[in-house]
From Swiss-Prot:
Record PTM text: Predicted to be exported by the Tat system. The position of the signal peptide cleavage has not been experimentally proven.
Cofactor, free-text remark: Binds 1 [4Fe-4S] cluster.
Entry protein name: Periplasmic nitrate reductase
GO aspect biological process, one term: nitrate assimilation
Length: 831
């Protein structure tokens, strides 16, 4: 053993101290914490597995297991901090019921819809799966199959899935669970700016003078970003925080202005603020004249319900929900003039004084304002409108695309931006904001993918809620679910989700790491690798793309979703899935598999195994014989480079704590559309919203319209659902972490104390919470973190033993097709 002078001095000092205490100890003894090298811990970096904030963590592995994580002090996102979920990341992969082998429903040794799950090999699993997909394709064509993916897919998993479905199987029936959380945000961006994702970044937190939360409980849902708001607010006395919600929550603890409004009335409040700005001559005319246009949107657009629903039948413009017509400023001003403070107060239940204080924050040209929102705005039957209306306020005042002035749509999932949106795994999208309905976009994708003209269908596929309806109705018969738990997370699950999974006509495949509610409803369960058991990439809410290496192996026969997707493609010959006229355009495809055409096309497979880091394993690269993650990423990056979505070269991301796109000439972009920050803004323009042909953003005239369902005599309460800080989504990971489970083991019904007293209820009482669709049994909570107003109850949805989505309504925004989980009518009765 070699002892350095430093070690010798340290040991001598310890021995001297021990001798002084009368204790005889060896000179080399020490009570100082040993080094990572002594413990044989290997540390690496990875983005957190949970929310869209995109925190970076340091991950320690030992003997093939993740044994510790801590916040990455080098990360500009979280600066060494973690929320409570992040602290326990090392445990999410090690639940006792982790799935380790494929499971197929069988009876008497063969597949049976009503059989019991039995272990099978991957070959048997893919063989029966391919048989069912081929049968459906033959009988019903591409529209008979479907896939439901995730904002938790890695970038290359989502890209491989989209390519397999849209180009391989020629079906646009692929959608991510981000349809439930971010579709309205996408719709808002595209309508107002013509390009998706925020123009600002997290640096805005250190520059803003006021923060306005529109339906976002950041203290629990984006706690690391909330620390930056709290630090700004507590460090600078002039800074103000306004929090708007349909109920009080932990974010109200920091609020200078707390606003509790009636569900759906945020539409009226936003229009009042615009009116206040105009009436008080606070319009930034130089900005508005140079950089905006005005349009009026189609109204009376329905609620995205089934066509036979009375509300849908009554809607006059359901088929043209996203349409709009140009107007001038005077027409717009006249439109919002109807939203007086008196009217807004009457609709919202918010005092006139509070509404005026809120409007003044935006109207004052000397106050830099950051607006922030998530599910309270997006999970809304007029969610796209609400996104548009918030942008209206920032555009009227010119408070946009500069440090501290930022309308910021926060993201829920770790890669809802990077995978669902940027990759384009929605049923209507292609990468880099391209869409399947645009022939030029399809042709561009086909060129990059080296496929013949006409490979990608032009018809928009089924979105998430429509997929469930089509499964129930027998229109989709072969269905693959990855990285989501929709039988727990979807709306109106008893009537519209579960029936499709158990429909005898259908074959349902679920890829997951744990036996979730959705997995248990499947016919075939495929065990998936998690997080750092594979090499991955996520894109967060500020356009930051982050990579990680594979650090450990998945248990048993579990395999990554990427491996599953690509390996499954080997089971299909081109002749089995493509029509003859398409093959005639590419005769060399004859006899080849979809794997050969999609993933061994000379581009995806161009990077050899030698380029994989020698310090890390890569099971997928080993399996396919080339660096598949790099190949998929570089092919995908072709879509965005030169089109405002530029990504850096693959290898650079492993060296960085992420980069914010567009990355041009090696430099990331902090503020988009602003000259000097965004390389796509032409010199001399100052501001240029280049997603629109004329470089101008749109200010929309959009009215208040009532919700699809409101309380009545029989069902007197509003129901709002959501999350809590301890649990991620449906709890399939976090409820398997003992510390997180103990912190919040069971969902409860938060209720105003006076409502409880009126119903003869006390805290802890068991109750039946019921809508016209279904019910759950839960317990009343009249204290604690969430404080609903009278007439509203709040129930989190993480608890698989209390499936609150049996109660919710499957109404959606008619433009974005996103579900409204925030408002339906219920009653609460003692059991």
């Amino acid at each position: 053993m070699t002892v350095t002078r430093r070690d010798f001095v340290r040991h001598q000092a310890l021995a001297t101290a021990a001798a002084a205490a009368g204790v005889a100890v060896p000179a080399a003894a020490t009570n100082i914490v040993t080094t990572a090298a002594d413990n044989k811990l290997v540390w690496s970096k990875a983005p957190c597995r949970f929310c869209g904030t995109g925190c970076s963590v340091n991950v320690a592995t030992k003997e093939g297991r993740v044994v510790a994580t801590h916040g990455d002090i080098k990360s500009p996102v979280n600066r060494g901090l973690n929320c409570v979920k992040g602290y326990f990341l090392s445990k999410v992969m090690y639940g006792e019921d982790r799935l380790t082998q494929p499971l197929l429903r069988k009876k008497n040794g063969v597949y049976a819809k009503d059989g019991e799950f039995e272990p099978v090999t991957w070959e048997e699993a893919f063989t029966i799966m391919a048989e069912k997909f081929k049968k459906t394709l033959k009988e019903k064509g591409p529209e008979g199959i479907g896939m439901f993916g995730s904002g938790q897919w890695t970038v290359w998993e989502g890209y491989a899935a989209s390519k397999l479905m849209k180009a391989g199987f020629r079906s646009n029936n692929i959608d991510p669970n981000a349809r439930h959380c971010m579709a309205s945000a996408v719709g808002g961006f595209m309508r107002t700016f013509g390009i998706d994702e925020p123009m600002g970044c997290y640096d805005d937190f250190e520059h803003a003078d006021a923060f306005v939360l529109w339906g976002s409980n950041m203290a629990e849902m984006h706690p690391i970003l909330w620390t930056r708001i709290a630090d700004r607010r507590l460090s600078y006395p002039h800074v103000q925080v306004a929090v708007m919600s349909t109920y009080e929550h932990r974010s109200f603890d920091l609020a200078d202005l707390g606003v509790v409004f009636t569900p759906q009335s945020d539409l009226a409040i936003a229009n009042f603020i615009a009116n206040y700005i105009i009436q008080n001559k606070k319009v930034n005319w130089d900005f508005v004249k140079k950089h905006t246009n005005f349009r009026v949107g189609t109204t009376d657009i329905g609620y995205g319900l089934r066509p036979e629903h009375p509300l849908q039948k009554a809607a006059k413009n359901a088929d043209s929900a996203g349409a709009s017509e140009p107007i001038d400023f005077e027409t717009y001003a006249k439109f919002v003039a109807d939203y007086t403070v008196e009217k807004a107060s009457e609709i919202s239940g918010v005092s006139e004084d509070k509404l005026i204080k809120l409007a003044k924050l935006y109207a004052d040209p000397n106050i830099k304002v950051m607006s922030l929102w998530t599910m309270g705005v997006n999970q809304h039957t007029r969610g796209v409108w609400m996104n548009n209306l918030i942008y209206n306020i920032h555009l009227l005042t010119g408070k946009i695309s500069e440090p501290g002035n930022s309308p910021f749509s926060l993201t829920g999932q770790p890669s809802a931006c990077g995978t669902a949106r940027e990759v384009g795994t929605f049923s209507h999208r292609l990468p880099a904001d391209m869409v399947v309905t645009n022939p030029k976009h399809r042709a561009y994708a086909e060129k990059i993918w080296k496929l013949p003209e006409g490979s990608i269908p032009e018809k928009v596929g089924a979105h998430a809620v429509l997929q469930s309806r089509k499964l129930k109705d027998g229109e989709i018969n072969a269905y693959w679910v990855q990285v989501n738990n929709n039988v727990q997370a979807g709306p109106n699950i008893n009537e519209e989700v579960l029936p499709g999974y158990r429909n005898p006509q259908n074959f349902i495949v679920v890829s997951d790491a744990y036996p979730t509610v959705t997995a248990q409803a499947a016919d075939l369960i495929l065990p998936s690798a998690m997080w750092v058991e594979k090499e991955g990439a996520y894109g967060n809410a500020e356009r930051r793309t982050q990579f990680w290496h594979q650090l450990v192996n998945a248990p048993g026969d579990a395999r990554s979703d990427l491996w599953q997707l690509v390996e499954f493609s080997k089971y299909f010959k081109v002749e089995e899935v493509w029509p003859a006229d398409l093959i005639a355009k590419m005769p060399e495809a004859k006899g080849k598999t979809l794997f050969d055409i999609l993933y061994k096309n000379g581009k995806v497979n161009k990077f050899p195994l030698a380029q994989v880091s020698k310090d890390y394993e890569n099971k997928e690269a080993d399996a396919f014989g080339f660096y598949i993650q790099k190949g998929l990423f570089e092919e995908y990056a072709e879509f965005g480079r030169g089109h405002g979505h530029d990504l850096a070269d693959f290898d650079r991301y492993h060296e960085e704590r992420g980069l914010r796109w567009p990355v041009v000439n090696g430099e990331e972009t902090l503020w988009r559309y602003r000259e000097g920050s965004d390389p796509y803004v032409e010199k001399g323009k100052g501001v240029q919203f280049y997603g629109k042909p004329d470089g101008k953003a749109i200010i929309f005239a959009l009215p208040y319209e009532p919700p699809a369902e409101s309380p009545n005599k029989e069902y007197p309460f509003w129901l709002c659902t959501g999350r809590v800080i301890e649990h991620w989504h449906s709890g399939s990971m976090t409820q398997r972490v003992p510390e997180l489970y103990k912190a919040f083991p069971d969902a409860v019904c938060f209720m105003h104390p006076e409502d409880a007293r009126s119903a003869g209820l006390r805290r802890g009482d068991k109750v039946k919470l019921q809508s016209i669709r279904g019910h759950i049994i839960t317990r009343i909570e009249t204290r604690g973190r969430n404080k609903p107003p009278k007439g509203l109850v709040f129930v989190p949805w993480f608890d698989a033993r209390q499936l609150i989505n049996k109660v919710t309504l499957d109404a959606t925004d008619p433009i974005s097709k996103q579900t409204d989980f925030k408002k339906c009518a219920v009653k609460v009765e003692r059991v």
